[in-house]
Amino acid sequence: MKTALILLSILGMACAFSMKNFHRRIKAEDSEENGVFKYRPRYFLYKHAYFYPPLKRFPVQGGSDSSEENGDGDSSEEEGEEEETSNEEENNEDSEGNEDQEAEAENSTLSTLSGVTASYGAETTPQAQTFELAALQLPKKAGDAESRAPKVKESDEEEEEEEEEEENENEEAEVDENELAVNGTSTNSTEVDGGNGSSGGDNGEEAEAEEASVTEAGAEGTTGGRELTSVGTQTAVLLNGFQQTTPPPEAYGTTSPPIRKSSTVEYGGEYEQTGNEYNNEYEVYDNENGEPRGDTYRAYEDEYSYYKGHGYEGYEGQNYYYHQ
């Protein structure tokens, strides 16, 4: 008897837990709070009387209402075929006319739409199925948009090609202007008239005379610096129409300081030595007598100075954690 009672109690507990699990119905979107054993009836009839919300069912044409009432399934199918043929014919028309027709068709369909929703107990007949799918058939001229898309792409490509051609022409014109400007500033131009009405050839002769006088002056010079200046001006090359007029640094007699000499001795008073002393400005206190924050400059400096003198294999990894 005792064993029978024990078995019955175990079976009763199992049934109770199973029924609780059946009523609980944990869903995937439920949180962990809903996992507690609670008696919550789910109102299955109220929630699952129908699986989808009521769909709005629009008639495709005005005659579809009469066909549905009369039960002529063949007539509705014939109307669908006629619509397909008419859509194919309309796809062959021009894009401008199609846009106007689309607007008119949408207005007419919206005006003829009725807010009739079929009852849920109605039988699912073929005309009812076509009637339910009428909402998907409202955008009739989808093919028109597809036919217009390649035309728009072609026009965009033509515009891009025209823009590229214009940019290339502008670049060529700028290059020609730059070449003309360079030729105008150089002394080798023989076609440009001078300011006093003299020809470009006269200007070239004057430039040659000036160069000869410069070479004579360079030969008469005594010091090495002056010789360098004359040679520098004589051998100055016209780079992009501009003449180099800056003489070399040896012309002024300036000597660069020796390379290996320490600069701190020479320029000791000119520069302020910073970085060696610690500034208290970096420490930010919440209160006047409070402790500094964790992100102070001192903390970063200590961490960096610890790593600064050692390589990665120069210290044991444990010492760093023990010293913290």
UniProtKB/Swiss-Prot annotation:
<keyword id="KW-0597">Phosphoprotein</keyword>
<comment type="subunit">
    <text>Monomer. Interacts with integrins; the interaction promotes cell adhesion.</text>
</comment>
<feature type="compositionally biased region" description="Polar residues">
    <location>
        <begin position="253"/>
        <end position="263"/>
    </location>
</feature>
<feature type="modified residue" description="Phosphoserine">
    <location>
        <position position="75"/>
    </location>
</feature>
<keyword id="KW-0765">Sulfation</keyword>
<dbReference type="GO" id="GO:0045785">
    <property type="term" value="P:positive regulation of cell adhesion"/>
</dbReference>
<feature type="modified residue" description="Phosphoserine">
    <location>
        <position position="155"/>
    </location>
</feature>
<feature type="modified residue" description="Phosphoserine">
    <location>
        <position position="95"/>
    </location>
</feature>
<dbReference type="GO" id="GO:0071363">
    <property type="term" value="P:cellular response to growth factor stimulus"/>
</dbReference>
<comment type="function">
    <text>Binds tightly to hydroxyapatite. Appears to form an integral part of the mineralized matrix. Probably important to cell-matrix interaction. Promotes adhesion and migration of various cells via the alpha-V/beta-3 integrin receptor (ITGAV:ITGB3).</text>
</comment>
<feature type="glycosylation site" description="N-linked (GlcNAc...) asparagine">
    <location>
        <position position="183"/>
    </location>
</feature>
<feature type="modified residue" description="Phosphoserine">
    <location>
        <position position="31"/>
    </location>
</feature>
<feature type="region of interest" description="Disordered">
    <location>
        <begin position="243"/>
        <end position="263"/>
    </location>
</feature>
<feature type="region of interest" description="Disordered">
    <location>
        <begin position="60"/>
        <end position="228"/>
    </location>
</feature>
<protein>
    <recommendedName>
        <fullName>Integrin-binding sialoprotein</fullName>
    </recommendedName>
</protein>
<dbReference type="GO" id="GO:0030282">
    <property type="term" value="P:bone mineralization"/>
</dbReference>
<feature type="short sequence motif" description="Integrin-binding motif">
    <location>
        <begin position="293"/>
        <end position="295"/>
    </location>
</feature>
<feature type="modified residue" description="Phosphoserine">
    <location>
        <position position="67"/>
    </location>
</feature>
<keyword id="KW-0730">Sialic acid</keyword>
<dbReference type="GO" id="GO:0005178">
    <property type="term" value="F:integrin binding"/>
</dbReference>
<feature type="glycosylation site" description="N-linked (GlcNAc...) asparagine">
    <location>
        <position position="107"/>
    </location>
</feature>
<feature type="signal peptide">
    <location>
        <begin position="1"/>
        <end position="16"/>
    </location>
</feature>
<feature type="compositionally biased region" description="Polar residues">
    <location>
        <begin position="106"/>
        <end position="130"/>
    </location>
</feature>
<feature type="modified residue" description="Phosphoserine">
    <location>
        <position position="76"/>
    </location>
</feature>
<keyword id="KW-0130">Cell adhesion</keyword>
<dbReference type="GO" id="GO:0031982">
    <property type="term" value="C:vesicle"/>
</dbReference>
<keyword id="KW-0091">Biomineralization</keyword>
<dbReference type="GO" id="GO:0036094">
    <property type="term" value="F:small molecule binding"/>
</dbReference>
<keyword id="KW-0964">Secreted</keyword>
<feature type="glycosylation site" description="N-linked (GlcNAc...) asparagine">
    <location>
        <position position="196"/>
    </location>
</feature>
<keyword id="KW-0325">Glycoprotein</keyword>
<dbReference type="GO" id="GO:0005615">
    <property type="term" value="C:extracellular space"/>
</dbReference>
<feature type="compositionally biased region" description="Acidic residues">
    <location>
        <begin position="66"/>
        <end position="105"/>
    </location>
</feature>
<feature type="modified residue" description="Sulfotyrosine">
    <location>
        <position position="321"/>
    </location>
</feature>
<dbReference type="GO" id="GO:0007155">
    <property type="term" value="P:cell adhesion"/>
</dbReference>
<dbReference type="InterPro" id="IPR008412">
    <property type="entry name" value="IBSP"/>
</dbReference>
<feature type="modified residue" description="Sulfotyrosine">
    <location>
        <position position="320"/>
    </location>
</feature>
<feature type="glycosylation site" description="N-linked (GlcNAc...) asparagine">
    <location>
        <position position="188"/>
    </location>
</feature>
<keyword id="KW-0732">Signal</keyword>
<dbReference type="Pfam" id="PF05432">
    <property type="entry name" value="BSP_II"/>
</dbReference>
<feature type="compositionally biased region" description="Acidic residues">
    <location>
        <begin position="155"/>
        <end position="179"/>
    </location>
</feature>
<dbReference type="GO" id="GO:0030198">
    <property type="term" value="P:extracellular matrix organization"/>
</dbReference>
